[in-house]
């Protein structure tokens, strides 16, 4: 049986109000709230402020990761939400971000990650690998 | 004129020797070296060890990000290298990782991010956005 390990939403958001995405202070609550809305488990998160404007944020999750990179000069956010486990979690986090940022258009793709894995190749004895 | 802000390599690596990817100690030098090989600028990196095995690593780069998630029980690494600037940097980092991990097969995609941006929509006065 084939199994995929996770689902990855890859979205470029256009026409976002630059004031919402110019600073790390602006994007950090959006990202942190998206993690909560998605019922995701944060291991750590890191934000960075570019000069004169623009920000990046990346969160390491127990379920994989979530990242934000912003170009306020273009009204652009490039967003990745990659989660394992309950597939609706990524959707919930994504829907929250769209609700807050209100892009005028979105280039959206959703990918299966690890989709060539077959359950029967699973190595069941972890000691084999140490 | 249309411009893309970056290039994103999305790759699932299969058939990787589980010993190379079972621990955060094993993957961290690979990731850090890939950043150097790609001439990328690290802002921060974070690693996490799953029990009984498997690891995640994520690096925030001035050029965007690089992430690793491993499932040694499947011989699987899901890898993302997303960079702005010189497009050959992502390729160099990717080539290094492939050379070290020697997967038996790779599901590889390369995407333009922010590809709907038009240069003429650029807002040139940053004060407009503050």
From Swiss-Prot, chains A, B:
Cleavage (non-hydrolytic) (site feature) positions: 63-64
Protein name: S-adenosylmethionine decarboxylase proenzyme
Post-translational modification comment from the UniProt entry: Is synthesized initially as an inactive proenzyme. Formation of the active enzyme involves a self-maturation process in which the active site pyruvoyl group is generated from an internal serine residue via an autocatalytic post-translational modification. Two non-identical subunits are generated from the proenzyme in this reaction, and the pyruvate is formed at the N-terminus of the alpha chain, which is derived from the carboxyl end of the proenzyme.
Residue list for modification Pyruvic acid (Ser): 64
GO cellular component term of the entry, any: cytosol
Cofactor(s), by name: pyruvate
PANTHER family in UniProt: S-ADENOSYLMETHIONINE DECARBOXYLASE PROENZYME (PTHR33866:SF2)
Role according to the record: Catalyzes the decarboxylation of S-adenosylmethionine to S-adenosylmethioninamine (dcAdoMet), the propylamine donor required for the synthesis of the polyamines spermine and spermidine from the diamine putrescine.
Active site (UniProt): 64 (schiff-base intermediate with substrate), 69 (proton acceptor), 84 (proton donor)
Pathway: Amine and polyamine biosynthesis; S-adenosylmethioninamine biosynthesis; S-adenosylmethioninamine from S-adenosyl-L-methionine: step 1/1
NCBIfam families on file: SAM_DCase_Bsu
GO biological process, one term: spermidine biosynthetic process
Origin species: Picrophilus torridus (strain ATCC 700027 / DSM 9790 / JCM 10055 / NBRC 100828 / KAW 2/3)
GO molecular function term, any single one: adenosylmethionine decarboxylase activity
The keyword Lyase is annotated on this UniProt entry: yes
Family listed: Belongs to the prokaryotic AdoMetDC family. Type 1 subfamily.
């Amino acid at each position: 049986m084939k199994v995929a390990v996770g689902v990855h939403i890859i979205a470029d958001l256009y026409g976002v109000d630059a004031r919402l995405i110019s600073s790390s202070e602006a994007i950090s609550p959006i990202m942190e709230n998206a993690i909560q809305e998605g019922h995701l488990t944060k291991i750590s998160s890191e934000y960075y402020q570019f000069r004169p404007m623009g920000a990046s944020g990346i969160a390491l999750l127990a379920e994989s990761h979530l990242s934000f990179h912003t170009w306020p000069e273009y009204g652009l956010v490039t967003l990745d939400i990659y989660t394992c486990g309950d597939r609706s979690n990524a959707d919930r986090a994504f829907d929250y971000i769209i609700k807050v940022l209100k892009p005028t258009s979105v280039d959206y793709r959703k990918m299966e990650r690890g989709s060539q894995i077959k359950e029967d190749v699973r190595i069941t004895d972890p000691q084999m690998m140490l």
